[in-house]
């Protein structure tokens, strides 16, 4: 008898609705999730997702001595955060590696100001444990679930290319993560291209195994993106610089306290603690803040060019035009290796 996923296990995925998906809905007002920290005359408006930057900063104690106010607005995913940044509804917000590409393609009013680099072990193509598929080349003619325009979509395209295939060689089924999990669990697709924490959840509850990871094909980057007018305001720019320093220290805290952060993250998102801890050790805690340098820009340009070729974005553009490097000082290069906790729940070498 095939094991089925109980509806309760699907709920956390609906709540998390991917930071790196370019087709997600959002609480555009941010009203219900809005709150304020700090003191002073200046207010920095920050776009966030549940269980992300605000939760990390609070857990690390980085919101205890703010010399300015932060007003938080909560969104369900990265794209609406960038819509808010572009519209001057927020000053800055954190997103994955794909939303800035789509926002820039739409000529949005944004500037990437900071980056963090993590392992790509959580960026995976999953198959069932009993699947006969052993390598990416075996996907030819098979069905693969993926969220359209997501980081996983790019990973699928790049992984297939590395194996000598094109996206036309597989049967792509565009599904958001919760729907993809259900389809994968019920054997309606042969494989699932996805990211953490969905990877960690599937490995624990869906009898999944990793066919390949994103190592060597995706850049493992996440970004902080600001509005240019906020950067032109000297006081706000100074606050943004301070905010980024706090994020860097908070990320260090996450790496040093994986269990403590996993408990908080699980409570924030509804994920089981074990899944949260797996994801922290596989992906979340491995991230280190790095410079938005030429290599980082080039890797994003590659994503943009790929999506333009697939006609997923309306135009080709120079990603460098949407970057502000003023906060790079003192940051290691984007090629800096992610941190590591050793082996997570399942670790496999990428297969070709």
Give the location of each predicted region.
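Conserved C-terminal helix/tail region of periplasmic/extracytoplasmic solute-binding proteins
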Residues: 305-352
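Secondary-structure end/capping motifs
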Residues: 233-314
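Short, glycine-/small- and polar/acidic-enriched structural segments
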Residues: 27-166, 172-174, 190-194, 209, ...
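Pocket-lining segment of extracytoplasmic ligand-binding domains
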Residues: 98, 178-269
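Extracytoplasmic/secreted envelope proteins and their assembly/folding machinery
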Residues: 54-60, 82, 86, 97-100, ...
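Bacterial signal peptide processing site
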Residues: 21-24
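C-terminal motif of bacterial Sec signal peptides marking the signal peptidase cleavage site
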Residues: 16-19
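Bacterial N-terminal signal peptides that target proteins for export
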Residues: 1-10
